[in-house]
Amino acid sequence: MYSFEDIKVFDPELADSITMEIARQNDHIELIASENFVSKAVMAAMGSPLTNKYAEGYPGKRYYGGCEFVDIAENLAIERAKKLFGCTYANVQPHSGAQANMAVFFALLQPGDTVMGMNLAHGGHLTHGSPVNFSGSYFNIVPYGVDDNGFIDYEEVEKIAKECKPKLIVAGASAYARKIDFKRFREIADLVGAYLMVDMAHIAGLVAAGYHQSPIPYAHVTTTTTHKTLRGPRGGMILSSEEFAEEHKLNKSIFPGTQGGPLMHVIAAKAICFKEALDDSFKDYAGKIISNAGALANELTARGFNLVSGGTDNHLMLIDLQNMNITGKEAEHILDEANITCNKNTVPNDPASPFVTSGIRLGTPAITTRGFNEKDMAVVAEAISLVVKDVDKNKEQAKALVKMLTDAYPLY
């Protein structure tokens, strides 16, 4: 197991950067929707000697010797993932959600095939068809988006699907604050003879806890990350039925298709994460993520902020700042000066460039892990409001509110 003291002795420059990052995490309110704080057990697994072991292949079928013990770790992760999400197949080797998505695309499609995915500018993800990503480079992408109220228009999705006849429809998002109807997506996919892939990276923890409709009964294949609302190590995973996975060789699409050796220390951390999520306490945690998000959304609305779709059903919200006469880039910067961390984000029909944006995305998974409750959301909203409306006048007052909360809820 690693010791931070060893790092300080051998590489004080790097140790300084880690120390400063620990301080930042402790002293800032973390509102990036895709970030969370892992448990000490998850962190310990990632710093374990399992990082030393090469294990190309799968449990019982490795290309290296000496894998009998890392096989135990991977099998634990697989069985726990299947139990957690109620499926018969799980591949826990993807290094990221993006690589899980890539593996599924290459397993089900040929270059040039048509794919429908949510428009990145409307809340989708790079890997759902952005032209700068592999998905937009190798495949013919037909995007769908949200209506003028910020909701997915399923009738419009069906209309587009009938017109373009995709081979694959991707459901899921990175900046969509409402529940997604996976059953409706499957009906549309069946109507046009398409596969349905659900990327539940952002909502996996909410699905596991029963607070969002599970895609497992409806999707041909589901991908996810293991961090975000699931609160595990940074990594990816593919879920499906054993029959579909075998027919389409999903395992081979990960190894040797898109990856070499798996990261056994991360897979061990995934196993711990899944065990944590199977505990009854995780359901309570996920419920608090949603209640905190709802409370924060209400408090921000009361202070004049414009929320895309008017609110949230999950862990995140998208704030359109055009009525505040400030860009997303500017808001991200000045909030960071007040020790509030968030990210700039495009809003539907955004007139600004993706490097500037007209909005910010906020999420509650990390602050909920820390212990923040619904009453605290009024303080968080007030700090945000003070900074966005007049940073020069109000920054110190906002920082004092932030310090009051971070002192009340120490991180580690």
Curated annotation (Swiss-Prot):
It is found in: Cytoplasm. Its cofactor is pyridoxal 5'-phosphate. The modification N6-(pyridoxal phosphate)lysine is found at residue 228. GO terms for molecular function: glycine hydroxymethyltransferase activity; pyridoxal phosphate binding. (6S)-5,6,7,8-tetrahydrofolate binds at residues 120, 124-126, 353-355. The record marks 227 as: Plays an important role in substrate specificity. It catalyses: (6R)-5,10-methylene-5,6,7,8-tetrahydrofolate + glycine + H2O = (6S)-5,6,7,8-tetrahydrofolate + L-serine. Its main location: cytoplasm. Gene3D superfamilies: Aspartate Aminotransferase, domain 1 (3.90.1150.10), Type I PLP-dependent aspartate aminotransferase-like (Major domain) (3.40.640.10). Its EC number is 2.1.2.1. Pfam families: SHMT (PF00464). InterPro entries: PyrdxlP-dep_Trfase, PyrdxlP-dep_Trfase_major, PyrdxlP-dep_Trfase_small, Ser_HO-MeTrfase, Ser_HO-MeTrfase-like, Ser_HO-MeTrfase_PLP_BS, SHMT-like_dom. One of its GO terms (cellular component) is cytosol. Belongs to the SHMT family. Catalyzes the reversible interconversion of serine and glycine with tetrahydrofolate (THF) serving as the one-carbon carrier. This reaction serves as the major source of one-carbon groups required for the biosynthesis of purines, thymidylate, methionine, and other important biomolecules. Also exhibits THF-independent aldolase activity toward beta-hydroxyamino acids, producing glycine and aldehydes, via a retro-aldol mechanism. Homodimer. This is Serine hydroxymethyltransferase.
